[in-house]
């Protein structure tokens, strides 16, 4: 097993300042289980996890102590002039097998769906996925489990 630590500002010896940085440094061998321990704080990140066999756990006393937050939304106009759309509005996209999220809050802060459209907090298109003691927050289409039709 390979264990990593993420803390705001990387104030933990040998740790990472963001989940994206930790994802990039994971062992390439998918057979090696990885546990990422996330220290309390708010992480403003849009995440995509494609490596299997990963556990991400908040190190706080409750899920509200460790928050992964982003604010993309479906009606947002992209640089190419096209709306972002529902399925690109996620805060956290999991596209890998054998993933566990534990003791975390994952939120999409886009706001009112009448003006912003759909805004997915967690998009899980995977096998053997577990979200344990997690808070998943948003205003519309908060959780999406794929695949797309």
What residues fall within each predicted segment?
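N-terminal extracellular ligand-recognition/capping segment immediately after the signal peptide
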Residues: 10-23, 30-55, 59-66
């Amino acid at each position: 097993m390979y264990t990593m630590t993420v803390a705001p500002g990387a104030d933990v010896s040998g740790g990472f300042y963001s989940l994206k940085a930790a994802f990039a440094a994971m062992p390439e061998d998918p057979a090696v289980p990885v546990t990422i321990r996330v220290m309390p704080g708010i992480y403003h990140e849009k995440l995509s996890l494609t490596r299997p066999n990963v556990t991400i756990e908040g190190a706080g006393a409750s899920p509200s102590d460790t928050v992964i937050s982003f604010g993309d939304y479906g009606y947002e106009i992209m640089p190419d002039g096209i709306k972002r759309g529902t399925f690109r509005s996620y805060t956290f996209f999991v596209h890998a097998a054998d993933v566990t999220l534990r003791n975390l809050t994952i939120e999409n802060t886009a706001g009112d769906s009448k003006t912003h459209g759909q805004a997915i907090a967690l998009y899980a298109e995977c096998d053997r996925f577990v979200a344990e003691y997690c808070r998943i927050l948003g205003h519309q289409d908060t959780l999406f489990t794929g695949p797309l039709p």
